[in-house]
């Protein structure tokens, strides 16, 4: 009995850690590829890196890149207005935290938004036959976990991943526009703990001050995990950074820090 309980305990701990690891991979792909790369053109990718990111996102999130990009670009074009897809200033931060996914889906499914904000990302043959099939991607990802680790661990890991990914990315839009520090004069905020959970996305104030910068950390003590992936990718020519300099933030946009 003791042996069984110990084995069960370590299986659960491993499954939770596995779910967290899967989410970390998904968050890195989201921030580096979807956000900094496709949405803001801060960096470009080699064909192998481009294909790898598409595959990872398909298996872990089912996201269609052009839809994600369209929603995000609309957010920047209409930040904290009625046209913002997920503004806590309009809807309340707790409402956005709880309903961010529904808000995202509403805008993502509207083809007029994709045509307007992501015209440069036309679907190719792989999108039409594979990557646009979200449920197939998620099902394949779960099936891989089942084959590698068994149904018990796979089920827990998948549950942890889904909840972690949705909650953390909702927090960027909700908490990241309500609580935290504002070293630059915009409505977004910086939160190191949120940045650690989202591979750098918690430095939302920095990002809104310099949206085309590939590096979200602006100060020596800020930890941007996405940048830690980008740098070695540039060494191996898997990515090329176009913009990462703090000169993108003009002195006129800086203000005093507030909590």
Identify the role of each PLM range.
Residues 1-171, 213-259:
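Non-catalytic, topology-defining segments of multipass membrane proteins
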Residues 117-125, 183-210:
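Active-site-proximal inter-transmembrane loops
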Residues 174:
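Glycine-rich, pocket-lining loop/helix-strand segments that form or immediately flank
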């Amino acid at each position: 009995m003791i042996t069984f309980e110990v084995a069960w305990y370590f299986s659960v701990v491993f499954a939770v850690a596995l779910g967290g690891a899967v989410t970390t991979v998904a968050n890195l792909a989201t921030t580096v590829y979807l956000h900094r790369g496709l949405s803001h053109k801060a960096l470009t990718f080699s064909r192998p890196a481009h294909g790898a990111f598409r595959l990872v996102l398909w298996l872990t999130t089912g996201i269609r890149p052009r839809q994600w990009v369209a929603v995000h670009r609309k957010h920047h074009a209409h930040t904290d207005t009625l046209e913002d897809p997920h503004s806590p200033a309009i809807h309340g931060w707790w409402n956005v935290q709880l309903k961010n996914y529904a808000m995202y889906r509403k805008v993502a499914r509207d083809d007029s938004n994709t045509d307007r904000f992501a015209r440069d990302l036309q679907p190719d043959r792989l999108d039409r036959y594979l990557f646009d099939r979200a449920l197939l991607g998620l099902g394949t990802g779960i099936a891989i976990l089942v084959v590698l680790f068994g149904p018990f661990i796979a089920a827990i890991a998948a549950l942890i991943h889904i909840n972690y990914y949705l909650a953390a990315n909702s927090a960027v839009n909700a908490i990241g526009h309500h609580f935290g520090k504002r070293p630059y004069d915009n409505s977004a905020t910086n939160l190191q703990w949120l940045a650690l959970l989202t591979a750098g996305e918690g430095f939302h104030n920095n990002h809104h001050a310099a949206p085309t910068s590939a590096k979200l950390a602006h100060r020596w003590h800020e930890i941007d995990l996405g940048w830690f992936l980008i740098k070695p990718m540039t060494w191996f020519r898997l990515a090329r950074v176009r913009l990462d300099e703090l000169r993108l933030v003009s002195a006129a946009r800086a203000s005093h820090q507030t909590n």
